[in-house]
Every structure is written in C-alpha cells, then in structure tokens.
Amino acid sequence: MPSIHVSKCADPAIKLAHRIAEVVRSKPNCVLGLATGSTPIPVYQELARLHREEGLDFSQVRTFNLDEYAGLPPTHDQTYRFFMEEHLFSKVNIKPENVHFLNGMASDYEKECERYEQELKAIGPCDVWLLGIGHNGHIAFNEPGSPRDSRTRVVCLTQSTIDANARFFGNDKSKVPTKALSVGIATIMESREILLLATGESKREAVTKSVKGKCETHCPASFLHEHPHCRFYVDMDAGKVVDNTCCQATNQASCCGSTSCHAAKA
C-alpha cells in the first residue's frame, strides 16, 4: 500500500527546496502548491538563492496557495498573498499572471471556493504540494474532523489554531480571523507529489501520529499515507521518534525500517 517516506536531517528545509528545484528544472511549466507560515520560510529563502545564484527559472512556473484568511483585504500584511510576495514571488522571476490565490474578500465564499477548485483542475493537477503541519495534525486549514473527500471550502478555525497563529497578529487572539478558505484533503491528494516540512519539538506529536498512526479524521495529515508519493522532511526534534524510513498506516500502525521500504537516508 502507499506509505509516507521520512527524511530526517539537520536541514530539512534545504533538502525540500532542492527537491522542488529538481521539479522546476525537469518541468519548467510545473504547477506548485505552496504553504505559508513560519516553517516554509527557509524553503523559500533557498529557492530565492537558487534563482539568484544558480539561475533557477520560475518564468513558466504556475502556483496555487493552500489557503487564505476570510475577511482580510489583499493589502493586509497577514494575508497569504502578502506573505508569498514578501518571501518568494518578489525574489524570483515568476509572472504575476501565473500565481493563483483564494480571495478572502469575495462576496460569495462558496462560489469563490468553486472557482478556485475549477481553476486548479483546469491548470493542474499540482506537480508538488508543499505542506506544513499544525500541532493538531491539520494540513492547510483542514482541521481535525475534516473528511477525506473534502474540497476547497470555507472552514472555521479551531481555538488551538487561532492560539498558534496569534503570534502573527501581535499575540492578540482577537485579531486572528476565525474563518478561512482552504483547499480540501481530496484536493491535496490529487497532487502528483506531496512534500511536508515539520521542524521543532512542538511538531513532534503531530508528526508521530501522522507517520505511525492510523488514517483518521482526528489527524488530517494521517490521510497522506494513502498518497503514492508523499515524503515528510523533518528535523531531529520533530522526528525524534520516527526513523529515516517508509512508514505504512495499518490497524496496528506499524513502522518498518528495512531497506526494502526504500528508506530515505539523510
């Protein structure tokens, strides 16, 4: 059955960025699904360096972002549009018409989500989705309880996610939007390849449940076991109790460390 491959090393963001660069070089007009938050910033820094110093060409690359807060104007410094411009798009030669975002100020969120889903289907599927993981195992804004067949939709953020994101809003939880637009788990799973980055001790429990646990709605990232080409890039803290290996979700949630599992040695 499909399984999650784990690559544990000191600089997982760099290794992940180089994998994305391989995809861009082999398919110049590739479609990338992109994540935001503090975790992927080093990935974008390395991609920008590869563009600046080694000529990595983004001129034909198309991108879709995972999610966007509901109710924040595009000029707000906490929108994910602003984030991507600050950390990647302004530093590479990507064309504005090739980047795609959900509109958090749309008058009809359901229609906006349907538009985005159809746009992704027309241009995609994504060659790579870059993901982070929340402390509660969420991917994008697919919080615990999100169904496996979920599509792009409006979601209500859990209190734990609001608490975690308050640091981006001056530690004022009242300023964190309570809703967001997010691609669904089924949308993510249609990508040809999924790369998830997790760093720090605070992500250890979520990584462990995702890699070694069963596929369950209470840990949305666990559904990634069903994808044929999914790799977790983790540092030593986040991956302390998992190995550089290929892990399969079963009723017993076993983890195999044999070379026949195509272990990803860092």
From Swiss-Prot:
Enzyme type, top EC level: hydrolase
Record-level GO cellular component terms: cytoplasm
EC number(s) on file: 3.5.99.6
Q: Name the catalysed reactions.
A: alpha-D-glucosamine 6-phosphate + H2O = beta-D-fructose 6-phosphate + NH4(+)
Active site at: 67, 136, 138, 143
| Pfam families the record matches | Glucosamine_iso (PF01182)
Chaperone among the record's keywords? no
- Kindly state a single biological-process term from the GO annotations of this entry: N-acetylglucosamine catabolic process
* Gene3D superfamilies (alphabetical): 3.40.50.1360
Location of the protein in the cell: Cytoplasm
Which CDD domains has this protein been placed in?
GlcN6P_deaminase
This protein's UniProt keywords:
Carbohydrate metabolism, Cytoplasm, Hydrolase
> What GO MF terms are annotated?
glucosamine-6-phosphate deaminase activity; identical protein binding
Subunit composition and interactions: Homohexamer.
PANTHER family named in the record:
GLUCOSAMINE-6-PHOSPHATE ISOMERASE (PTHR11280:SF5)
The record's function comment reads: Catalyzes the reversible conversion of alpha-D-glucosamine 6-phosphate (GlcN-6P) into beta-D-fructose 6-phosphate (Fru-6P) and ammonium ion, a regulatory reaction step in de novo uridine diphosphate-N-acetyl-alpha-D-glucosamine (UDP-GlcNAc) biosynthesis via hexosamine pathway.
> So what family is this one in?
Belongs to the glucosamine/galactosamine-6-phosphate isomerase family.
The protein in question is named Glucosamine-6-phosphate deaminase 1
According to its UniProt entry, this protein's organism is: Giardia intestinalis
UniProt lineage: Eukaryota, Metamonada, Diplomonadida, Hexamitidae, Giardiinae
Its gene? Answer: GPI1
